[in-house]
Amino acid sequence: TRAAIFQDNKILLVQENDGLWSLPGGWCDVDQSVKDNVIKEVKEEAGLEVEAKRVVAILDKHKNNPAKSAHRVTKVFILCKVIGGEFQPNLETIGSAYFELNDLPQLSLGKNTPEQIALCFEACHAKHWETRFD
């Protein structure tokens, strides 16, 4: 799961230990729903409490990300709303910041691409969004 969190028309990205940036998120644990997992991952990586509001997209990683893996992976992008918290350094991320679409930092392309982030911006601005899926 990957969380799309907006503030002032900017999207939240977290900086990983390797210096690359991504939407907060991670593997979905077998005992958690997609909704519960995205809430947990945002708390772990960004220190924020969120409400999951809308599914933006359900995408096949092999079709949409350059980094390939031996496993078939489905990525679920969720539009979320912040309800509390603040960033705390942790084991997975060293920082967080909000970015405009035309000013994205160097991304972790196996986790999210500029096109996927643009899709999140599009969903954020749409009154009636239809989930994109492969």
Label each residue range with its predicted role.
Residues 23-25:
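Thr-Gly-centered strand-to-loop micro-motif
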